[in-house]
Amino acid sequence: MNKRRVEVFPETETILSQVGEQIKLARLRRQLSVEEVASSAGISRTTLWAVEKGNSSVAIGAYAAVLRVLDKMDSDLLFMAKDELFASKIKGIQLNARIRKSNK
């Protein structure tokens, strides 16, 4: 069974790379080793290295787990949709809501 590869835009790759750099800097500022963070996050060292490189094939749960270990920074993920710049970029996109059929 082959996994489907999701196409990632170059801008997204750049953002993920920057996020990875910030995660690595946060780990180094806290003087935490790769082993400590990976173990606390419940991921392998290889996955942590991929997170720090901004690899787009890493599950978002791994990013969230690492951010949680680095002083609960994962709560920042909740505020992304409130960011004005982010909101202005998605303003034109129609969000699909599930419409339920009436039982009447």
Can you name each region flagged by the protein language model?
Residues 77-104:
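Short, charged recognition helix plus adjacent turn
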Residues 21-37, 97-104:
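Short basic helix-loop element that most often maps to the first helix and adjoining turn
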Residues 31-49:
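Short alpha-helical DNA-recognition segment
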Residues 61-79:
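DNA major-groove recognition helix of helix-turn-helix/homeodomain DNA-binding modules
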Residues 33, 59-62:
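Residues that mark the N-terminal boundary/hinge immediately upstream of a DNA-recognition element
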Residues 2-29:
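A short, Lys/Arg-rich alpha-helix, primarily the initiator
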